[in-house]
Amino acid sequence: MAERAALEELVKLQGERVRGLKQQKASAELIEEEVAKLLKLKAQLGPDESKQKFVLKTPKGTRDYSPRQMAVREKVFDVIIRCFKRHGAEVIDTPVFELKETLMGKYGEDSKLIYDLKDQGGELLSLRYDLTVPFARYLAMNKLTNIKRYHIAKVYRRDNPAMTRGRYREFYQCDFDIAGNFDPMIPDAECLKIMCEILSSLQIGDFLVKVNDRRILDGMFAICGVSDSKFRTICSSVDKLDKVSWEEVKNEMVGEKGLAPEVADRIGDYVQQHGGVSLVEQLLQDPKLSQSKQALEGLGDLKLLFEYLTLFGIDDKISFDLSLARGLDYYTGVIYEAVLLQTPAQAGEEPLGVGSVAAGGRYDGLVGMFDPKGRKVPCVGLSIGVERIFSIVEQRLEALEEKVRTTETQVLVASAQKKLLEERLKLVSELWDAGIKAELLYKKNPKLLNQLQYCEEAGIPLVAIIGEQELEDGVIKLRSVTSREEVDVRREDLVEEIKRRTGQPLCIC
């Protein structure tokens, strides 16, 4: 403290000296020299931490989750994981941070959103931007050529968050990917089927899945006169068509990205089209587009994809949309994105997209970027945007004023008289050992009314009540919280009766 006080006095004196020199209109060189001394003293002094008010909050773009929010999240995750497992996926995990070199050059214009870490050892690190690039690195490192995997974990982006709309800097992704050499479009169709199954199961509203193909985009841009160097940057402009008008997109391409107006008009003739398999067939006959080998390959695969989607019974949920041009650099084939739709009444006329909730595509070259010999492993996958889904489900539950249980407790062990703590402890231990989710209140002599109220507030369905008479008779009084019906159950039959009432399997092995 004494040392700091001495420094503060020196800063004060030096400040007075600088002010005096300025009043005396001393030479600029002398003033500059004395100002430098003042700044040096201030740097030594550092900030006065005692005067700084610490604001207790989470970092920008992040949030805490309450027990209620976590209960909603667990339900959403459960739907997603059950679907992934139903389709035969294995689960993996990767580090939350990667070598910076691993992530750079994989995301195009979005690379600027990657979080960099300062490591004391000098290693250049970054927080993962998504789960796909780490998966490709994992495949190359382990020399894997065939796997169906899912991965649920947090990713990080230095984006400008809109937290009310489910956009954050730290958020979960739920990914499903199929790696390996297979016949065309079968894995791609399954990914779209999974996407539709999950969105239907979550019951968050009507949705539409837009599909396109990177080869069609590249072929279309080539025949329209876009140079190779502008392919990716024009893609990012076209991809905004779901949010802004064609005129605004055209102005950006011409004004900001230097595209000739006639080239932009030719692009506009294509990217404003959307439809089903009939549009695919129409474009296969397009005299200009058919000059591109890339575009023809993409259209041929999309035609086959629609055949499989019809067999899966989801073709009515899919729209071929030429404006879909997702910005990630690593996509090489089919790309897709699911959007929630407003109803015609909400939208005014036709259904409109109100936000992306899932996306994915084929990335056949990404693993080869990490393999020392450049060996490619074809991959296709999808990612569920769960943060937006959490927000939608939470809003729906609030609107319905629906109570959400935050625990899974099946039974509360209660007592009707005093001095029965030991008996409650013995019984709750028996229930835990039998795999029953049970609780008791942490009081020696709780009132029965307080115990019953706790069950109602927490949504616990059953109460196992111990009394002196019940102990003499070798029974436990089992009470239903909702119906208030009570029955005496022999102690040795209690576990079986609770499992029967709660629908829990009798064997936990």
Curated annotation (Swiss-Prot):
Amino-acid positions noted as binding L-histidine in the UniProt annotation, renumbered to this chain: D130, L131, T132, R157, Q173, D177, R326, Y330, Y331
Residues bearing the modification Phosphoserine: S66, S356
WHEP-TRS domain ranges (all copies): 3-59
Record EC number: 6.1.1.21
UniProt superkingdom: Eukaryota
An example Gene Ontology CC term for this record: cytosol
Molecular-function annotations in GO: ATP binding; histidine-tRNA ligase activity; protein homodimerization activity; RNA binding
Swiss-Prot/TrEMBL catalytic activity: tRNA(His) + L-histidine + ATP = L-histidyl-tRNA(His) + AMP + diphosphate + H(+)
Keyword check for Magnesium: no
SUPFAM superfamilies: Class II aaRS ABD-related (SSF52954), Class II aaRS and biotin synthetases (SSF55681), S15/NS1 RNA-binding domain (SSF47060)
Keywords annotated in UniProt: Acetylation, Aminoacyl-tRNA synthetase, ATP-binding, Cytoplasm, Ligase, Nucleotide-binding, Phosphoprotein, Protein biosynthesis
GO biological processes: histidyl-tRNA aminoacylation; mitochondrial translation
Keyword RNA-binding in record: no
Localisation per UniProt entry: Cytoplasm
Modified residues (N-acetylalanine): A2
Database matches in InterPro entries: aa-tRNA-synth_II (IPR006195), aa-tRNA-synth_II/BPL/LPL (IPR045864), Anticodon-bd (IPR004154), Anticodon-bd_dom_sf (IPR036621), His-tRNA-ligase (IPR015807), HisRS-like_core (IPR041715), HisRS/HisZ (IPR004516), HisRS_anticodon (IPR033656)
Family label: Belongs to the class-II aminoacyl-tRNA synthetase family.
Oligomer and partners: Homodimer.
Function according to Swiss-Prot or TrEMBL: Catalyzes the ATP-dependent ligation of histidine to the 3'-end of its cognate tRNA, via the formation of an aminoacyl-adenylate intermediate (His-AMP). Plays a role in axon guidance.
Protein name: Histidine--tRNA ligase, cytoplasmic
Organism: Pongo abelii
